[in-house]
C-alpha cells in the first residue's frame, strides 16, 4: 500500500515547512504533555540560574507528538541555537565530528531517530556527551596517534520512537528521559483551535472537537485533518468548520469516529477474518496485509494498542473484544481466556521500554 495515509503520523515533505509555521516557540504556548512540560520548566530555570547548559535529554514515544517542537522550545528558552539532524543522516563518524565542532557554547543539538545511529558514530557520542570532547585517530599503522579535540558545552536532545533499540551505554548518558503520550481530546481540540487561528480558518468549538476526536491523539494528524476539512468548508460550506461539516468531510476521507482509516481496519479485519482473531505472528500478519513488519509495529500498532483493539502476547497478536465491536462483529466468548485484561495490558504498555 503505497498511497499516502491521511492519518500517517510521519510528516510529508510538503508538511515540513507548514509545520514550522504552526510550532509553538515557548513552553507557555505548548499544549499538553503537562508532566513533561513542568519538569522541563524546572530544569530550564535551574540551568539558567546556574549559567550552565541543560543536561542531555531523551524524548521517546510515537511519531507526531512534539519531540522536535520541544527541542526547538528548549533552545528558544535557553537563548541558544538549535541544530537539527537525524540518525540516518549521520553516516560516518566524520559527519558527526563536523557537526559537533561547529556548535557554539550552550547550543542544542537535536538528533531525531537517534536509535538509527550506526555503532561507529554512536561511539563518537560517548566522550562528546560525557567529557565534551572527541577522540580522533590521525594517521595509519605504527604512526597512528590519538588526538582529543575539546568541544563547547552543549545539550544533546535525542528523539526516538523505539526506545528499546537504544543501546544501554547511549541511553545511560542522558540526564533525563521523557515519555510523550498520545494527547487527550481536550488538549488536541485546543491545538486544532490554535492552528485554525493561525491559519485564519473560522471553526466552531464542536467542529474542533470533532477533528480532535478523530486525530488519533496526535497533533500532526489533527492539524492535517484540519487542513483537509478546511477545503470542504471552503468548497461546499460557507467557510466555517462546524461539527456537521467536519463529520461529512472526515467520513468521505474514510477516517472513522476513532480516527481509524482503511489500513487500520484492514489489519483488524485480517486478524479477525483470516486468523479467527489470532494469535498470529507479526511476519504472517505483515504478509497477509502486504505491509512491512516494522511498519506495522512502529506505525499502525501503537494507536491500536492504545485503543485496546489489539494485544501483543507471547504467541502473537490478537484482536480484542473492543476490535470486534468496533467492526460490528460478534465476539466469540470462547476467546476470553486469550485476552489480557485491558487495564493490565495498558500498564504493561506504559512500562514497556
Swiss-Prot record:
E.C. designation(s): 3.6.4.-
Stretches for region Large ATPase domain (RuvB-L): 1-183
GO cellular component terms, A-Z: cytoplasm; Holliday junction resolvase complex
Residues where Mg(2+) binds: 68
Principal localisation: cytoplasm
Domain remark in the UniProt entry: Has 3 domains, the large (RuvB-L) and small ATPase (RuvB-S) domains and the C-terminal head (RuvB-H) domain. The head domain binds DNA, while the ATPase domains jointly bind ATP, ADP or are empty depending on the state of the subunit in the translocation cycle. During a single DNA translocation step the structure of each domain remains the same, but their relative positions change.
Highest rank taxon of the organism: Bacteria
Annotated region (Small ATPAse domain (RuvB-S)), positions in chain: 184-254
PANTHER family membership: HOLLIDAY JUNCTION BRANCH MIGRATION COMPLEX SUBUNIT RUVB, PTHR42848
Spans annotated as Head domain (RuvB-H): 257-353
InterPro entries for this protein: AAA+_ATPase (IPR003593), AAA_lid_4 (IPR041445), DNA_helicase_Holl-junc_RuvB (IPR004605), P-loop_NTPase (IPR027417), RuvB-like_N (IPR008824), RuvB_C (IPR008823), WH-like_DNA-bd_sf (IPR036388), WH_DNA-bd_sf (IPR036390)
Binding site for DNA: 312, 317
Family to which this protein belongs: Belongs to the RuvB family.
Localisation per UniProt entry: Cytoplasm
Recorded name of the encoding gene: ruvB
Function: The RuvA-RuvB-RuvC complex processes Holliday junction (HJ) DNA during genetic recombination and DNA repair, while the RuvA-RuvB complex plays an important role in the rescue of blocked DNA replication forks via replication fork reversal (RFR). RuvA specifically binds to HJ cruciform DNA, conferring on it an open structure. The RuvB hexamer acts as an ATP-dependent pump, pulling dsDNA into and through the RuvAB complex. RuvB forms 2 homohexamers on either side of HJ DNA bound by 1 or 2 RuvA tetramers; 4 subunits per hexamer contact DNA at a time.
Protein name (Swiss-Prot/TrEMBL): Holliday junction branch migration complex subunit RuvB
Binding site for ATP: 22-23, 64, 67-69, 130-132, 173, 183, 220
Quaternary assembly: Homohexamer. Forms an RuvA(8)-RuvB(12)-Holliday junction (HJ) complex. HJ DNA is sandwiched between 2 RuvA tetramers; dsDNA enters through RuvA and exits via RuvB. An RuvB hexamer assembles on each DNA strand where it exits the tetramer. Each RuvB hexamer is contacted by two RuvA subunits (via domain III) on 2 adjacent RuvB subunits; this complex drives branch migration. In the full resolvosome a probable DNA-RuvA(4)-RuvB(12)-RuvC(2) complex forms which resolves the HJ.
CDD domains, per the entry: AAA
Reactions performed catalytically: ATP + H2O = ADP + phosphate + H(+)
Keywords on record: ATP-binding, Cytoplasm, DNA damage, DNA recombination, DNA repair, DNA-binding, Hydrolase, Nucleotide-binding
Amino acid at each position: 500500500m503505497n498511497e499516502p495515509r491521511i492519518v500517517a503520523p510521519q510528516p510529508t515533505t510538503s508538511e515540513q515547512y507548514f509545520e514550522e509555521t504552526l510550532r509553538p516557540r515557548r513552553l507557555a504556548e505548548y499544549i499538553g504533555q503537562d508532566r513533561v512540560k513542568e519538569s522541563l520548566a524546572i530544569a530550564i530555570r535551574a540551568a539558567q540560574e546556574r549559567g550552565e547548559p541543560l543536561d542531555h535529554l531523551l524524548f521517546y514515544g510515537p511519531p507526531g507528538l512534539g519531540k522536535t517542537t520541544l527541542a526547538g522550545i528548549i533552545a528558544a528558552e535557553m537563548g541558544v541555537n538549535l541544530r537539527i539532524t537525524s540518525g540516518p543522516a549521520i553516516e560516518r563518524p566524520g559527519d558527526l565530528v563536523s557537526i559537533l565542532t561547529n556548535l557554539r557554547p550552550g547550543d542544542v543539538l537535536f538528533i531525531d531517530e537517534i536509535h538509527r545511529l550506526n555503532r561507529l558514530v554512536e561511539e563518537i557520542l560517548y566522550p562528546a556527551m560525557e567529557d565534551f570532547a572527541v577522540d580522533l585517530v590521525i594517521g595509519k599503522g605504527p604512526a597512528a596517534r590519538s588526538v582529543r579535540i575539546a568541544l563547547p558545552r552543549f545539550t544533546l536532545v535525542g528523539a526516538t520512537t523505539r526506545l528499546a533499540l537504544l543501546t544501554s551505554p547511549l541511553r545511560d548518558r542522558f540526564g533525563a528521559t521523557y515519555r510523550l503520550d498520545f494527547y487527550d481530546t481536550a488538549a488536541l481540540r485546543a491545538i486544532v483551535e490554535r492552528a485554525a487561528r493561525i491559519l485564519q480558518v473560522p471553526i466552531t468549538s464542536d467542529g474542533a472537537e470533532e477533528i480532535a476526536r478523530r486525530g488519533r491523539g496526535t497533533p500532526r494528524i489533527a492539524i492535517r485533518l484540519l487542513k483537509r476539512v478546511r477545503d470542504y468548508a471552503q468548497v461546499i460550506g460557507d467557510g466555517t468548520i462546524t461539527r456537521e461539516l467536519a463529520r461529512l468531510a472526515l467520513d468521505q476521507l474514510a477516517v472513522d469516529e476513532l480516527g481509524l482509516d482503511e489500513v487500520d481496519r484492514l489489519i483488524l479485519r485480517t486478524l479477525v477474518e483470516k486468523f479467527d482473531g489470532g494469535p498470529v505472528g507479526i511476519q504472517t500478519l505483515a504478509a497477509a496485509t502486504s505491509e512491512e513488519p516494522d511498519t506495522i509495529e512502529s506505525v499502525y500498532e501503537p494507536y491500536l494498542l492504545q485503543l485496546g483493539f489489539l494485544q501483543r502476547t507471547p504467541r502473537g497478536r490478537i484482536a480484542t473484544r473492543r476490535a470486534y465491536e468496533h467492526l460490528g462483529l460478534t465476539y466469540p466468548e470462547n476467546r476470553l481466556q486469550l485476552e489480557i485484561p485491558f487495564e493490565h495490558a495498558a500498564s504493561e504498555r506504559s512500562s514497556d521500554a
